[in-house]
């Protein structure tokens, strides 16, 4: 068998002698032998493939998807699932505590839950976890009527509502409804109004302010018999992830500001809702830092400061 020196192999492979020595020392060249202080390498030895550097997600969506698929516990995905499920359901009247929801998510069991907690609260909690996964997995998909109906179907499957003849799970409402004193879109007009809304969003600039406008208009249509608020907030999460807008969770203790902000928006006063959601963005950025994503947090903060300085309301970010 013919052998080559370190220098000859380096010239043949187009790399440095130091790299060849490293390959030899780490047993990455078959047949290489050290004799009297010199490496002898078979002339027909194959060049080792370079180890690929580990790549890290550069967007929030990438982080969430990586942690979800690898089932990492105690990270950003873990925190988001628990926080958004607790707050979004609590806004709608769920009696489960944050700790109880954490327990259900982490153990897939009920633990010690009082008899006064409605079964629907438990079912809708599990369903909400699935809906958040759906949003993360399909965030890049187009926002369509079929997609929105699927979110509603996931949320309401197996609930007491799903067994009512007049309640349409995964379909638009059959009966007219109201929200407080606000009239919503008549059932017969929902498809038309939703089509118009989604057509507008498709062509609109994907800014923070326009995203909130989408949310307000969706809630005013109120396309489903129940579950509109939770579906609407899931849409917010999806589109934030898709368009690299800093996500936010509407905290339950900001419920009053959130509802007042929705009302104000319809009358041309946008500050309250925007400030409420910006607060949620600030909390999310703190979470990025807490879980080791400082560079992404810095990028988000820089974009926000630039937007405020320029007098705009565009809150987008990307590491790319």
List the model feature ranges, each with a label.
Residues 1-13, 17-22, 26-28, 34-320:
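FIC/Doc superfamily catalytic core
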């Amino acid at each position: 068998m013919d052998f080559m020196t370190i220098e000859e192999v380096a010239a043949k492979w187009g790399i440095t002698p130091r790299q060849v020595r490293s390959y030899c020392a780490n047993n990455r060249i078959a047949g290489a032998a050290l004799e009297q202080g010199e490496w002898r390498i078979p002339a027909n030895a194959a060049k080792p493939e370079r180890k690929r550097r580990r790549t890290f997600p550069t967007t929030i969506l990438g982080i969430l998807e990586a942690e979800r698929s690898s089932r990492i516990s105690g990270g950003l995905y873990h925190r988001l699932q628990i926080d958004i499920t607790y707050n979004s359901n609590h806004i709608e009247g769920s009696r489960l505590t944050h700790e109880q929801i954490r327990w259900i998510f982490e153990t897939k069991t009920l633990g010690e839950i009082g008899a006064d907690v409605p079964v629907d609260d438990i079912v809708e909690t599990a369903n909400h976890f699935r809906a958040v996964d759906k949003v993360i997995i399909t965030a890049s998909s187009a926002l369509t009527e079929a997609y929105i109906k699927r979110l509603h179907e996931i949320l309401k499957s197996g609930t007491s509502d799903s067994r009512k003849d007049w309640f349409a799970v995964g379909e638009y409402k059959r009966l007219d409804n109201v929200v407080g004193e606000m009239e919503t879109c008549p059932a017969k007009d929902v498809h038309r109004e939703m089509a118009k809304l989604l057509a507008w969003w498709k062509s609109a600039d994907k800014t923070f302010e326009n995203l909130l406008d989408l949310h307000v208009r969706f809630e005013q249509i109120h396309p489903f018999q129940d579950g509109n608020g939770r579906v609407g907030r899931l849409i917010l999460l999806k589109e934030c992830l898709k368009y690299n807008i800093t996500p936010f969770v509407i905290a339950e203790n900001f419920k009053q500001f959130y509802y007042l902000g929705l009302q104000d928006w319809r009358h041309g006063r946008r500050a309250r809702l925007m400030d409420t959601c910006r607060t949620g963005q600030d909390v999310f950025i703190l979470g990025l830092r807490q879980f080791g994503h400082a560079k992404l947090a810095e990028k988000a903060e820089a974009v926000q400061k630039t937007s405020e300085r320029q007098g705009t309301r565009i809150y987008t970010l990307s590491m790319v």
